């Protein structure tokens, strides 16, 4: 609701300052540019990180110097998390696709992904020429989002406009676009398709077109109609007498191939090739129980509860744990009164878990995984008598539940808390690829009477 006023930035400066002459001056110029831009937008940069020795030296005297880079992350207040726009094109012919410019600059190819593929850098880089215009554009788009007038949207970044359009189609499995660029003044089609001037592409229902135009025009924000969705699985791009056809499924393979080539250097046992061959063969699908309504009331949950239930749960965390607040809220919604327990509470004896009926070990990277995944956390239980006694007494009771998420699951494995009665216990081993994996997996929950999974039976 507060627009840019609630936005704060975090800047991560990565620069080879000590490696060669002139880098300090380049860093100063970059910092001043960011500072001036933020002052114009009236937003702050209260935090960040500096890595100013970005150089790799080798025994033969050679060295590789990292390019000076700043990574900026923005955070702001979101008053309604349901008002979101995803970059997935809606296959509806009664909609229109628009481009909204944020730069107020001519289209330029300097520093673009297109230039890099040609082994070039370029000397003309697009930038925001008018900070006040940028602010107006941002606020106008926020108004469109707030009023629910945008069906889909995506920013223009690496790869330019054509990559943005393709990525909006990669996210679905059917349909495409027919794009006409005649209303864009620039005549150079390469610049139109590959320039990375700040801007966005939005999809709007035809019944909302006039309302969208009115908001943008009242704000003085430039926009251009690009085209409409089509049932064909391609993007047709035309300007004047020239038309180009981009096959979406073919271009998706091209788009993914760079990731595959990098993955091939990092993954073992042919996993990279298997992933490349399989990545588009697994649509993400969900199947819920027939009587699932997606309402709190179905499970007797009151999200506005302000009275204690008398049943306590505890979040147990170590240095490096994260996600504990979200987990605490989930437990609260499930009816628990939630308390926050740190390992120092258990080690010192301040906390005994005697009044707790459920504990959750949250995920993250306890002790930065320095000793291995959750091994240091497990040691804090095993080698501190009061913490171990509290845990042993907790699991000896018959009125307790426990859950380990991510790093917390690894902890439960290390502590032998999963099926402790088995003669052989599980161990967390390396993946076949010998690297961290984050995949979409299909899991079916069978009919069960588990306290935590019973309501998901058949999902």
Question: For each of these PLM feature ranges, what is it?
Answer:
Residues 9, 46-48, 74, 99, ...:
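General beta-strand structural signal in soluble alpha/beta enzymes
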Residues 1-37, 49, 57, 139, ...:
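Thiamine diphosphate
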Residues 25, 63-66, 170-174, 375-383, ...:
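A glycine- and small-aliphatic-rich helix-loop capping segment at beta-alpha/alpha-beta transitions
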Residues 68, 198, 439, 458:
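Residues that flank catalytic or metal-binding motifs in active/ligand-binding sites
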Residues 202, 433, 444, 448-459:
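Catalytic core of tubulin tyrosine ligase-like
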Residues 1, 27-32, 44, 50-194, ...:
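Intein/HINT protein-splicing elements and their conserved insertion hotspots or analogous self-processing inserts
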């Amino acid at each position: 609701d507060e627009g840019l006023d609630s936005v704060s930035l975090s800047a991560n400066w990565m620069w080879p300052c000590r490696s060669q002459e002139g880098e300090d001056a380049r860093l100063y110029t970059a910092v001043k540019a960011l500072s001036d831009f933020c002052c114009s937008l009236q937003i702050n940069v209260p935090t960040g990180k500096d890595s100013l020795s970005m150089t790799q030296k080798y025994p033969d005297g050679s060295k590789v110097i990292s390019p000076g880079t700043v990574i900026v992350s923005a955070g702001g207040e979101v008053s309604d998390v349901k008002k979101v726009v995803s970059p997935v094109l809606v296959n509806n012919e009664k909609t229109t696709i628009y481009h909204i410019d944020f730069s107020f600059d001519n289209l330029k190819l300097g520093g673009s992904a297109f230039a890099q593929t040609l082994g070039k850098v370029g000397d003309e880089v697009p930038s925001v020429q008018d900070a006040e215009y940028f602010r107006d554009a941002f606020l106008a788009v926020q108004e469109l989002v707030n009023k629910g007038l945008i069906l889909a949207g995506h920013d223009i970044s690496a790869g330019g406009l054509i990559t943005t359009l393709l990525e909006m189609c990669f996210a679905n499995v059917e349909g495409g676009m027919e794009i006409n660029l005649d209303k864009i003044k620039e005549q150079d089609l390469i610049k139109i398709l590959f320039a990375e001037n700040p801007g966005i592409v939005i999809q709007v229902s035809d019944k909302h077109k006039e309302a969208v135009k009115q908001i943008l025009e009242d704000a003085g924000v430039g926009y251009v109609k690009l085209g409409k969705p089509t049932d064909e699985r391609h993007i047709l791009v035309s300007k004047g007498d020239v038309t180009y056809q981009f096959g979406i499924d073919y271009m998706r393979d091209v788009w993914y191939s760079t990731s595959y080539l990098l993955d091939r250097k990092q993954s073992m046992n042919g996993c990279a090739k298997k992933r490349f061959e399989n990545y588009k063969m697994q649509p993400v699908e969900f199947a819920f129980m027939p009587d699932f309504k997606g309402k709190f009331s179905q499970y007797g949950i009151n999200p506005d509860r302000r009275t204690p239930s008398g049943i306590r749960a505890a979040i147990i965390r170590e240095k490096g744990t994260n996600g504990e607040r979200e987990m605490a809220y989930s437990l609260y919604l499930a009816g628990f009164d939630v308390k926050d327990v740190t390992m120092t509470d258990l080690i010192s004896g301040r906390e005994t878990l005697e009044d707790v009926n459920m504990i959750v070990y949250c995920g993250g990277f306890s002790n930065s995984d320095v000793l291995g995944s959750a091994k240091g956390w497990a040691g804090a239980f095993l080698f501190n008598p009061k913490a171990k006694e509290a845990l042993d007494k907790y699991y000896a009771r018959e009125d307790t539940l426990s859950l380990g998420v991510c790093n917390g699951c690894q902890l439960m494995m290390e502590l032998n808390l999963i099926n402790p009665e088995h003669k052989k216990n599980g161990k967390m081993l390396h993946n076949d690829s010998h690297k961290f994996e984050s995949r979409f997996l299909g899991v079916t929950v069978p009919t069960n009477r588990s306290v935590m999974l019973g309501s998901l039976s058949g999902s």
